Every structure is written in C-alpha cells, then in structure tokens.
Amino acid sequence: MKKKNVVVFGGGTGLSVLLRGLKTFPVSITAIVTVADDGGSSGRLRKELDIPPPGDVRNVLVALSEVEPLLEQLFQHRFENGNGLSGHSLGNLLLAGMTSITGDFARGISEMSKVLNVRGKVLPASNRSIILHGEMEDGTIVTGESSIPKAGKKIKRVFLTPKDTKPLREGLEAIRKADVIVIGPGSLYTSVLPNLLVPGICEAIKQSTARKVYICNVMTQNGETDGYTASDHLQAIMDHCGVGIVDDILVHGEPISDTVKAKYAKEKAEPVIVDEHKLKALGVGTISDYFVLEQDDVLRHNASKVSEAILEGKPRTSSSIQ
C-alpha cells in the first residue's frame, strides 16, 4: 500500500507535538513552517544576519529527527550567559551557519535535515523573511508577529509584507501531490495564517484533491482569540483564504478538568467552545473526540490519536465542501 503524502502547515509547539506523533505512522511528511517570527533568538538572528527566523524550523527538525537524545538536547540547548550568546539556541546558530554556507535558507534546512536524520521534509513557507502586520477592529495597524497579541485589541485581519513574497516551488508541488493537508494546531493569527497568506498557498490548497483538516486549538489565546468558538477560528481562516480551504475541523469535544482550566484562566485563556451547528452551517465536517493529554496541568494534543483521526480518511460529512 502506498504511503500517504501528508502536508502539515504551522509553527510553534503545537506543530512539533503533532509531528512527533505523525512520524510514527507509515506516511510521507512535508512540514511547511512559518517564517514570520520576530522575537527572541530568532528575531535577533533575523535582524543581524538578514535571514528568515530559524526557531520554528528548529523545533520541527527536532520533532522529526531520529537521533540520539543527547544530540537532540544539544540542538535545543540555549545559552544562558555569554556576551552576544545569551538567549541563543545552538540549533538556531547552526541553522544560521548552514544558511551562510549554502547561501540559501531552504537548502540550509535540507542539509541540516541530513545531519539530524529527519524523517520527512521540512520547508519554510517562503525563502525570505516576512513581516506580519495586524489590522485591528479600530483600524490601527500593528507590525510584527510578537507585537500583535500584545496590542490588547481585537484583530480584524493579518497580512504580510513584502507583497511579492513567493512560496517554494517544492512546497506547491507537495500540496499538489498531497493525500491529506493539515492546518494547525498553533496560534491562529501568528502561526497558522502567516503560512497560508504567502501568495499562492491558499489557491494551491483549494485546488488540491487532498482531504483538508484544520486542527482547532483547545484553548483561546489572550490577545489573539479571546472568546473565540471553534467556528470563529474557522471563519477567520475562511475570511483570509476563502471557501474550500477546509473540509473537516478536528476539535476536542470533551470537558477539561477544573484545575487545568484554573491554570489557563491565569493566562486569560479558556476552553474553545465547539459550536457544531455553526460549523455545519460553514459547510465542514466535525471530527470530535477526547483529543488532549493533561500533563502537569498543561494541555497538549494527543499526537497519535489526532494523527490516527486525520489519516483514517473516514468519509466527509454530506455538508463538507467538495
């Protein structure tokens, strides 16, 4: 039986968690990773070396790598002191070095993938740095991925500059050949949408015959999705990309423990309400189950259970967009 081709879009911790589960299945993975990050070590390297931010890519490489734990630990090591080194992750520096050697960010990732024995392919959403801007409901424009959630305003839309940003040809080819396309999980406006907004990506996904699944976040995110239901998350993606971008939405449809809710409430986050009637009205199928793991009062998607549901390929509901 031929391996399924799975293309996954995202960034941040959520994507890495999913990929660790997905790589245990007999699938061919292409991860397309956001390059809008402008904070921390990534932001500094981006500014000083004029390269796309390596942090999200680093986490994805580690998630898909098959190396000794010590090498993984080394790649993720963050310096705590040292003039100029403090705060930097060794993996970010190695990716910056490989980009310098090869003269190309995507090629640098490809070479680093060999070093880390990566299972699958890791591609940046674009081969150049992109700047994410948020237009707020009151009309103000906030520039920079890390600044948008701090603005304390309701987000109307996000957009990228430069406007002539291009996707990688390899990425478009992977979308064309995909059997399953997965969007998320991750911060809606600052991890998920920056990938989709690279010109040509939304169109390629909509034209693809693959099953398109959006993995909805389990909790809202302060400064980004306050008060959002599952349909609000999906509506935001459709507002930016149009109809036909998602066939099925995967949601955690069970209650969350009071202790976990209390911990997240301190960060002004609350469980995302699954409003199935509105999801149906948007024309998508709903995959609902107990999809999370609670560890130390922190929620993470149960990667193997989520992967199984995505790959199951059960028939789309009659209401889904074809």
From Swiss-Prot:
One of its GO terms (molecular function) is LPPG:FO 2-phospho-L-lactate transferase activity. Keywords: Cytoplasm, NAD. It comes from the Bacteria. NAD(+) binds at residues 13, 217-219, 263-267, 300-301. Its main location: cytoplasm. It is found in: Cytoplasm. InterPro entries: CofD, CofD-like_dom_sf, Gluconeogen_factor. GO terms for biological process: regulation of cell shape. One of its GO terms (cellular component) is cytoplasm. Coiled coil: none annotated. Required for morphogenesis under gluconeogenic growth conditions. Belongs to the gluconeogenesis factor family. NCBIfam families: CofD_related (TIGR01826). This is Gluconeogenesis factor.
